[in-house]
Structures are given as structure tokens and as C-alpha cells.
């Protein structure tokens, strides 16, 4: 792209943002094959903030909205002047919430009662908030996600390592998350034991993952709608329902299954095991950076992305802390399972209040929320991997994009890998243990990515 320095700064910055966006028509030509009639901008190769070498926030962050008054839509998808459909603050925030917050972990934390508050807040202060702030700062200055951020500091190869670590961690995580969906769906049909059937779990993983891939292949606007709507009804609504149940439980004087003394606010200290517990909760907040690749899908990234991150941070803490306490108040610790613990917790509440019909309904909503998290994670890391692939670090076949400008050259092989991993539930009797080991290994690799990011 030729840069005419006589343009107003805001126009140049806008052009830079469009050029850096993977979905932009201007980005379809690799810098290495740019037309010789147009001088190549050295910043596109040297690793400046964007292809013009001008900070992306120099003009774009100060621009007004389409109405000339800086109005920002926050509840509906909008279109910019070029007719391109844009994300909104609420959509991106919801995608981030469903990518990070998982209802599956609530029962395990409920076992610690009031101490779970501190066990959530410490990792939030030392990891979640710093990660959110770093992601907001980097995303509004350097477009492209983790790959671009690390590349700016350490070069292309280390940048590729960072995005690969993020991507491979997710490839292993997809079957685990969809297995949780399979268990929730078994409660929908009143067959909770079906979740132990390897063939059933593998079939659900394969079908739902490829369905998620088809959604992602249709383009950013569709997956944003699916992710935000499913996240609302499948993550926020069940979390709020647990909070309501917990309040009612206390208000009517039902027996509380955990200690409410002030001393219970401090988790028991058992040496190194307590440190491991806090670290594991740190990893529960991983993913705040994954949707930074969609910053360019906002009308005004410099203003809207930090707002989306701030909103997502507040919602994540809401989804995790208060529902965990509600479960701790009402559900005996011995009944808290791991994979199906959240379903058992809701069944305890519904059966107690004579609403047994609610268990399959809420299990379906939880499955939708988990499905939304899969959709949210499919698009982010693979899109960042595409940015690395286009520098020549991956074969041309993996750089292929479809008519919707989505990275099908990466998503299709990714789906094949997930399909093979899903078959392990059938082939290996202790498939859950094998997958847990793989996830632990992938998470350790993910920590290296965060070290590079910070």
C-alpha cells in the first residue's frame, strides 16, 4: 500500500488499520509478492506497529463515529462507511467471557467455601487484570494478536512460536470442552450415565466441533452473533440463576453446607499444594488475549477494545465468584463431581424446590454456553496463526482463505486433528486421564506464551 504523507493523520491511520486486518481486501497480497510498481513499505517487514509505521491509535483512536459525534453502538452489530459489518463492544466482551469463564470449574472451587473468594481474587489481581490491561494496550497499538505483539520484540520466529503455543493448546482443549458439552446433553435426556460412554462422547465431539468450524468459516459476524447469544443464555444466565438460588437458600434459612465464620475466608495452608492450587486458578483465567485479533472488527478499536476488556473482566468475576458460593451453600461437598458437577448442583437446587423439570433445561443452556466458548476459541488462535503463515513460516496450503476471507487452510486440518483426538475416547479405556495429561502439558506450554507476551 502506498502511503501519501500529505493525507490527514487520521486517514493514514485508518488505512493502516485496514491493511493490518486479516480480513481486509488490501491484506490479501503478501508483502513478499507486492506489485513492483508500488514501493513496499519497509515497516510491513521490519515490524513497526502497522504497515504505515504510524501508531494505529494516532488517528483511529480519536476518530468520531459514523454520525460525527463518536457514538458507539454496544448492543447491535453495526456497519462502517465501507459497508463492512463490525463487532460491537458487548459482542466482543461476551466472546471474551465465554472464552475464559467456565461453569465446569465452579463445583471444584465450591469445595473451599468462603475461601474460594480469595482463591479467585488473588489470581485475578496478579494475572487476570494485568493480562487484560496488557492485551488492551497491545491490541490498540499493534493489530494482529499475540503473534504480532511478540514479533515486534523478538522477531518473526519467536512470534510464530508464541502463536503456535496458543494454537496447539487449544487443539488439545477442544475435545475436553466438547466432552463437557456431551455430559451436559446427557442430562438433557435424563441419561446422566451416558457421559461415561466413549463412543457417545467421541461422536458428540466430532459433530459439534465440525459444526463450530462451519460457523467460523462463515465469517466473523456470524460467529460473533452465535458466540455472544450463546454466551448470554448459556453462561451468564445459568450463573445468575445460581446466584438467585443461593440468595433464596440463605433467605429462607435452609442449612448451609459450608462454614460462614470469618476464619473460613482464609484457605487452609498445606504447603506447596496450596501454591499449586493458586497457580491452577491462575490458569483458569487464561484466554483474555485470544480475541485481541478481532480489535480491528470494532468501529473504533482504541476506545472500544479497552471497554470490551473491562466489561469482560467484571463479568468473568461475576460468573465465577458468586455462583461458586451459591453451590457451596446448598450442595454437600460429597456430591460435587468434576465433569458433571455443575449439572449435579443444579439438580440439587431444582429437586429441592420441586422443579425437577429445570435440570434438563439448564443443562441444555450450559451446553450452549460451552459451545459458544468453542466457537470463540476456534477463530482467534487460527487467525493469528494465519498472520504468521503469511510471512512464509508455513506452507502456502495453510494460508488458503475462503470466499468469506476465513482461514480454511488452517481450520480444516485443525478439525482433522480434533477428530483424531476424539477417537481416543473410544480407543483408550482411560481416555479422560490421557486427555487430562495432554491438557496439563499444553497448559504448561501456554505459560511460555504468556512469558513471551509479558
State the predicted function of each range.
Residues 147-150, 155, 187-192, 308-375, ...:
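TM-loop-TM module centered on a large, flexible mid-protein loop between adjacent transmembrane helices
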Residues 110-111, 129-209, 213-217, 222, ...:
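Hydrophobic transmembrane alpha-helices that form the core helical bundles
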Residues 93, 118-122, 160, 202-207, ...:
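Hydrophobic alpha-helical transmembrane segments
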Residues 132, 187, 212-216, 242-246, ...:
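Structural signal for membrane-spanning alpha-helices in multi-pass inner-membrane proteins
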Residues 8, 68-74, 78-82, 148-152, ...:
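Helix-loop-helix connectors at the membrane interface of multi-pass transporters/channels
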Residues 76, 83, 114-118, 193-200, ...:
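Helix-loop-helix junctions that connect adjacent transmembrane segments
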Residues 95, 120, 124, 170, ...:
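Hydrophobic alpha-helical transmembrane segments in multi-pass membrane proteins
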Residues 1-21, 26-33, 37-136, 140, ...:
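Membrane-interface "cap" regions at the ends of multi-pass membrane proteins
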Amino acid at each position: 500500500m502506498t502511503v501519501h504523507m500529505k493525507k490527514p493523520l487520521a486517514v493514514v491511520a485508518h488505512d493502516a488499520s485496514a491493511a493490518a486486518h486479516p480480513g481486509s481486501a488490501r491484506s490479501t497480497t503478501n508483502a513478499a509478492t507486492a506489485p513492483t510498481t508500488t514501493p513496499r513499505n519497509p515497516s510491513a517487514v521490519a515490524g513497526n506497529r502497522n504497515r504505515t509505521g504510524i501508531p494505529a491509535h494516532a488517528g483511529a483512536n480519536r476518530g468520531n463515529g459514523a454520525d460525527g459525534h463518536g457514538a458507539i453502538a454496544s448492543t447491535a452489530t453495526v456497519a462502517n462507511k465501507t459497508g463492512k459489518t463490525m463487532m460491537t463492544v458487548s459482542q466482543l466482551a461476551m466472546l471474551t467471557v465465554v472464552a475464559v469463564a467456565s461453569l465446569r470449574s465452579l463445583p471444584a472451587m465450591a469445595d473451599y467455601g468462603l475461601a474460594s473468594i480469595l482463591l479467585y481474587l488473588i489470581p485475578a489481581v496478579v494475572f487476570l487484570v494485568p493480562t487484560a490491561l496488557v492485551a488492551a494496550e497491545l491490541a490498540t497499538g499493534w493489530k494482529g494478536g499475540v503473534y504480532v505483539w511478540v514479533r515486534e520484540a523478538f522477531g518473526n520466529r519467536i512470534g510464530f512460536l508464541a502463536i503456535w503455543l496458543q494454537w496447539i493448546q487449544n487443539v488439545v482443549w477442544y475435545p475436553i470442552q466438547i466432552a463437557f458439552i456431551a455430559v451436559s446433553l446427557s442430562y438433557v435426556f435424563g441419561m446422566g450415565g451416558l457421559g461415561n460412554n466413549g463412543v457417545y462422547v467421541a461422536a458428540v465431539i466430532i459433530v459439534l466441533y465440525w459444526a463450530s468450524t462451519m460457523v467460523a468459516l462463515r465469517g466473523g459476524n456470524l460467529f460473533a452473533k452465535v458466540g455472544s447469544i450463546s454466551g448470554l443464555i448459556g453462561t451468564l444466565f445459568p450463573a445468575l440463576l445460581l446466584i438467585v438460588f443461593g440468595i433464596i437458600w440463605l433467605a429462607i434459612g435452609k442449612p448451609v453446607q459450608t462454614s460462614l465464620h470469618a476464619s473460613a475466608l482464609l484457605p487452609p495452608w498445606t504447603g506447596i499444594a496450596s501454591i499449586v492450587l493458586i497457580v491452577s486458578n491462575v490458569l483458569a483465567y487464561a484466554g483474555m488475549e485470544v480475541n485481541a485479533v478481532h480489535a480491528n472488527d470494532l468501529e473504533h478499536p482504541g476506545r472500544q477494545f479497552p471497554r470490551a476488556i473491562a466489561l469482560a473482566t467484571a463479568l468473568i468475576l461475576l460468573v465465577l465468584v458468586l455462583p461458586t458460593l451459591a453451590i457451596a451453600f446448598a450442595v454437600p461437598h460429597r456430591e460435587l463431581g468434576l465433569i458433571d458437577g455443575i449439572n449435579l448442583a443444579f439438580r440439587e437446587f431444582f429437586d429441592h424446590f420441586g422443579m425437577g423439570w429445570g435440570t434438563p433445561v439448564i443443562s441444555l443452556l450450559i451446553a450452549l454456553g460451552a459451545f459458544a466458548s468453542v466457537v470463540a476459541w476456534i477463530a482467534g488462535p487460527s487467525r493469528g496463526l494465519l498472520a504468521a503463515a503469511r510471512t512464509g513460516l508455513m506452507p502456502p496450503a495453510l494460508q488458503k482463505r475462503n470466499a468469506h476471507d476465513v482461514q480454511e487452510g488452517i481450520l480444516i486440518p485443525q478439525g482433522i486433528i480434533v477428530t483424531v483426538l476424539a477417537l481416543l475416547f473410544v480407543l483408550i479405556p482411560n481416555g479422560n486421564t490421557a486427555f487430562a495429561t495432554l491438557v496439563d502439558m499444553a497448559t504448561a506450554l501456554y505459560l511460555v506464551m504468556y512469558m513471551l507476551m509479558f
